[in-house]
Amino acid sequence: MKIRSSSFIAAWLLTAHAVICTAGQLIPGGRSFDLASLQQAAVDTDPRLQQLQLLTTQTELRLRNIAAGRLPSVTVDGQAQYQSDVPRPAFTLPGGGLLFTTPKATYDSGLRIDQRIFDASINAQGALERAQLAEQQARVRTTLFSLRQQVNEAFFTAATLQARQGALSATITDLSARLDETNERVGAGTALPAEAASIEATLLQRRQDEEELRATRRTALARLAILTGQTISENDALAMPDLAAAVSRARQTSGELRARPEYDLFARTRERLAKQQDATAAQERPRVSTFARVGYGRPGLNFVSDQFESYGLGGVRVQWNAWTWGSSSREREALAIQQRIVAADQAAFAKGLGESIEGDSATLDRLQAMLALDDRIVALREQIEQSTQARFQEGVVTASEFLDRSSELLQARFARATHQVELAQAGARLLTTLGLEVR
């Protein structure tokens, strides 16, 4: 990343901070809100924040279910059955009797206990659940981080209007003083009533502008209040953040920073896919378990008996899905492709982020240059306005010409105030783009 005039921009950010904080003090009887606390309030009051704890609780329940797979499973069953034919002995006893008689109606009930000894899929499934939790929580944090940029926009919209109110208030105060002087001159016969009327009309127009600014600012503050869950009135001031040092450091290290939550989300997604591959492979491994059954029925284990008997049995079972026709390997290959897709998404995100950083840096440079001219323009407009004011008091120029110069000075102050806020906004936007907190 190319570094451009960081020291100059730092100086101008300090100037913007000082000037706009002064404008904020023009609003009496209110509280002061800073950008960092409002950003945090937006995150803290967003309903989606509770998803982090809900996801944790959900995963804990699922992990308990997975861990229960290691515990013995107990099954109780029973059945009654009638069959049309049964085994018969191939020969008879002397006298024509049968060696044994097998009943056609059978009854059986019992209790079965199964205990897993080895099952690789249990650990793999638990690891997959934890990886899914990390991915889901990273996605929630990414969503919540987007609130910071929304707060930035609402905050600086209101701050721009606040700064303009300060400039307009100074103009109204000056016009009120000029109107009083002109009325005195009219009373003394050294000025025409039309000149006083012209100044008064302009003063009323400026007061209209002030009321319009207040209404627009109330709307901006209302949006900011909704975003942050705070109660913000029009008497409250917005304190501009001092971002000079942070912006300077960020511009020097922007190429190496990976603070955006999206980077963590990409990493968690890759980890989840890797755990999913492990879980797929674990399904192919043999499973070993023991079993035992006790029961009562007719017949018992002696199938040639026609008496009700109790019985018991136990053993070891091995299960192995030895041949899956390549389905498991294809699934793992599909997951590997998904990892490559995630890598491509991350590369595209990094590219877009780089473009945004370049744009923010260019905006900082542009506003720094404009502010250097703004200061000179305002200084010249003040000189011209003061000179015209003195000549107007002497009756050399008309009220119309004086008001034209006053309007030009107001527009110059408006432009400077707007550029000062825009410079601070560009600094905050750069920090947010890089994933850094505004402090």
Regions found by a protein language model. Name each.
Residues 51-66, 143, 147-167, 177, ...:
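Amphipathic alpha-helical coiled-coil segments
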